Amino acid sequence: MPRIDISRLPDESRIWIFGISPALDKPKSLRLLSLVDRFLDDWSAHGQAIVSARDLLHGSFLVIAVDQQSETSGCSIDRMFGLLRQLESELGVVILDPNRIFYQDGSGKVATMTRPEFVENGRQDMVVFDILAERIGRIRRGLWQKPARDSWHGALIRQAS
């Protein structure tokens, strides 16, 4: 079976993190995970099953991970993005918006701003989520959550100064 529990993947495993806005409630979370599981169970590249896993963090971040021994292809990645477009439509959420910045608000909840809003209102001490992280080990070590000043997000704020 190509889909495994994400905890079984090594830290070097390739990941894609997709921010979801608004955050999913329990029924939508379950629906999303069901559709993603079905996709991952059949995901392949050049006829070879892709050993993969998924997780949903904070109800706002879909993580898709691939074992480093599996090879993806342009077509297999395109199919993954097709799934994401389907999820957006079916669940009434935004997943593929590159202009969304995800951060932790004052109460510790995940919130979003557009990139222009972040340039205007972001602060260097805001905890942001780096959805560009490429290895699962970065999530496990908490390196994808950090103050904006320690991330590429800080440069957006500096540009506005």
Regions found by a protein language model. Give the residues of each.
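Helix-adjacent hinge/juxtasegments
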Residues: 64-95
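Residues that form generic nucleotide/phosphate-binding pockets
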Residues: 35, 39, 90, 121
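Terminal interaction module
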Residues: 92, 96-161
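Short Gly/Ser/Thr- and Asp/Glu-enriched loop/turn motifs at secondary-structure junctions
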Residues: 11-13, 56-61, 96-99
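Short, intrinsically disordered low-complexity segments
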Residues: 49-66, 70
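Long, hydrophobic N-terminal alpha-helical segment
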Residues: 4, 11-56
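Ordered hydrophobic segments in well-structured contexts
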Residues: 15-19, 61-65, 102
